[in-house]
């Protein structure tokens, strides 16, 4: 028997400020990304969380990407 897909899915969160920051503002090159899970039934819209960005060395808004 095949298993049905679960309710929880894995999503990737990306820093919104790393894309627009200049090289002088960043501590290291690149974009901060986190992976987490979300409940497909409860959260239909994209997830937004405040997370620590190691490139900017502060808390920034991270949004779900595809």
Swiss-Prot record:
It comes from the Bacteria. Keywords: Ribonucleoprotein, Ribosomal protein. One of its GO terms (molecular function) is structural constituent of ribosome. The keyword Repeat does not apply. It holds the Pfam family Ribosomal_L33. GO terms for biological process: translation. GO terms for cellular component: cytoplasm; ribonucleoprotein complex; ribosome. Belongs to the bacterial ribosomal protein bL33 family. HAMAP family: Ribosomal_bL33. This is Large ribosomal subunit protein bL33B. The gene is rpmG2.
